[in-house]
């Protein structure tokens, strides 16, 4: 039997990069079809294809790493770099929205009456639900760290409990934000205030949902005993992502909710 | 400034250089003086004082602002939809 004389993982041919690319193409053109031709078909199909791609690709990675042992420490290192670079790209993404917000709010244009918040906009009180949301995310950062230490210390039950708490806090945040959105007196089409507020907090909320799903997958994997006390990169990646989401919220809270009111 | 406001108004030729707005785009200069005229008038008439000093701002905004903008803002003020804080 031939052995490989290196620690890298030569992945078997896989269709998922192609289906992923196809779904991305269909998503964008589907968006154009939705906007201009009032047709939902393409975008609907592309979302199904995207979900199938994600499920099967990540399932394959789990099979390759956890069950087939392809994730040597070198492979794990490159996966770490990959996750870090992805999170850096997400930081760049949010940086743009913060730039927009500060551009509009530091020197408001005459069309806005040269004031911020503009006349007629009643901003949300930062020290009500937004402050609670800050506490929730900070607390979930603590619980996910607890989960990590439990994992490393081989206390399986504690890990399940603390990870579950983290997920519950994430869901609680999402529900509270949803309530705030429903009950706010302004919406996205209300001048630059509405645009900056809902685009920035909206994308953040989307990332909270993604992070919560990622953590939930980790919980399911932990219940199936995929992780060991020394090898659990999937969980670490989820925890890094979750901390990133928390930090973005802190910036949102201080800039948009607090300073911007 | 050793001139009184009456002297300044009498010697007015055009809007002088305003260091708050040093660049080519003078939109904010126009808007700020428009706001200041109405704020000044509101404040002084509320105190029961002659609003003559406010005339400076009126002269400046009339020199700087496009007429269509002034008409638009005046209409907005009448309809109660003016965005500025007067």
Curated annotation (Swiss-Prot), chain A:
Keywords noted in UniProt: Membrane, Mitochondrion, Mitochondrion inner membrane, Translocase, Transmembrane, Transmembrane helix
Mitochondrial intermembrane side: 35-40, 106-128, 184-190, 257-261
Bilayer disposition of the protein: Multi-pass membrane protein
Transmembrane segments: 16-34, 41-66, 73-105, 129-152, 156-183, 191-223, 233-256
Reactions the enzyme catalyzes: 4 Fe(II)-[cytochrome c] + O2 + 8 H(+)(in) = 4 Fe(III)-[cytochrome c] + 2 H2O + 4 H(+)(out)
One Gene Ontology term, aspect cellular component: mitochondrial inner membrane
Domain of life: Eukaryota
Chief localisation class: mitochondrion
InterPro entries: Cyt_c/ubiquinol_Oxase_su3, Cyt_c_oxase_su3_dom, Cyt_c_oxidase-like_su3, Cyt_c_oxidase_su3-like_sf, Cyt_c_oxidase_su3_a-hlx
EC main group: translocase
EC numbers for this chain: 7.1.1.9
SUPFAM superfamilies per the UniProt record, alphabetical: Cytochrome c oxidase subunit III-like (SSF81452)
Compartments, record wording: Mitochondrion inner membrane
Family, similarity comment: Belongs to the cytochrome c oxidase subunit 3 family.
Biological role stated in the UniProt entry: Component of the cytochrome c oxidase, the last enzyme in the mitochondrial electron transport chain which drives oxidative phosphorylation. The respiratory chain contains 3 multisubunit complexes succinate dehydrogenase (complex II, CII), ubiquinol-cytochrome c oxidoreductase (cytochrome b-c1 complex, complex III, CIII) and cytochrome c oxidase (complex IV, CIV), that cooperate to transfer electrons derived from NADH and succinate to molecular oxygen, creating an electrochemical gradient over the inner membrane that drives transmembrane transport and the ATP synthase.
Record's subunit section: Component of the cytochrome c oxidase (complex IV, CIV), a multisubunit enzyme composed of 14 subunits. The complex is composed of a catalytic core of 3 subunits MT-CO1, MT-CO2 and MT-CO3, encoded in the mitochondrial DNA, and 11 supernumerary subunits COX4I, COX5A, COX5B, COX6A, COX6B, COX6C, COX7A, COX7B, COX7C, COX8 and NDUFA4, which are encoded in the nuclear genome.
Identification of the protein by name: Cytochrome c oxidase subunit 3
Lineage: Eukaryota, Metazoa, Chordata, Craniata, Vertebrata
Encoding gene, per UniProt annotation: MT-CO3
């Amino acid at each position: 039997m031939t052995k490989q004389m290196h620690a890298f993982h030569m992945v078997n041919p896989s269709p998922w990069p192609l289906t992923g690319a196809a779904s991305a193409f269909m998503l964008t053109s589907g968006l154009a079809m939705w906007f201009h031709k009032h047709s939902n078909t393409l975008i609907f199909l592309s979302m199904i294809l995207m979900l199938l791609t994600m499920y099967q690709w990540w399932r394959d990675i789990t099979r390759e790493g956890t069950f087939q042992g392809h994730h040597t420490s070198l492979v794990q290192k490159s996966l770490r770099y990959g996750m870090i670079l992805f999170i850096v790209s997400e930081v760049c993404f949010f940086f743009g929205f913060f730039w927009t917000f500060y551009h509009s709010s530091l020197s408001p244009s005459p069309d806005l009456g040269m004031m911020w918040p503009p006349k007629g906009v009643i901003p949300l009180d930062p020290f009500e639900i937004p402050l609670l949301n800050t506490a929730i995310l900070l607390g979930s950062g603590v619980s996910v760290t607890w989960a990590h230490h439990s994992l490393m210390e081989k206390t399986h039950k504690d890990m399940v409990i603390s990870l579950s708490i983290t997920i519950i806090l994430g869901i609680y945040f999402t529900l509270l934000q949803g309530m705030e959105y429903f009950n706010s007196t302004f919406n996205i089409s209300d001048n630059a205030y509405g645009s900056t507020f809902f685009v920035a907090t909206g994308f953040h909320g989307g990332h909270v949902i993604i992070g919560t799903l990622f953590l939930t997958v980790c919980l399911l994997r932990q219940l199936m005993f995929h992780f060991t006390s020394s090898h659990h990169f999937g969980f670490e990646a989820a925890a890094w992502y979750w901390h990133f989401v928390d930090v973005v919220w802190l910036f949102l809270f201080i800039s948009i909710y607090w300073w911007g009111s | 400034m050793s001139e009184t406001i009456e002297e300044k108004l009498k010697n007015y030729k055009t809007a002088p250089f305003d260091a708050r707005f040093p660049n080519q785009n003078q939109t904010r200069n126009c808007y700020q003086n428009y706001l200041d005229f109405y704020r000044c008038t509101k404040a002084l008439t509320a105190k029961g004082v002659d609003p003559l000093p406010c005339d400076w701002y009126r002269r400046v905004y009339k020199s700087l602002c496009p007429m269509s903008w002034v008409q638009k803002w005046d209409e907005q003020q009448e309809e109660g939809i003016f965005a500025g804080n007067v």
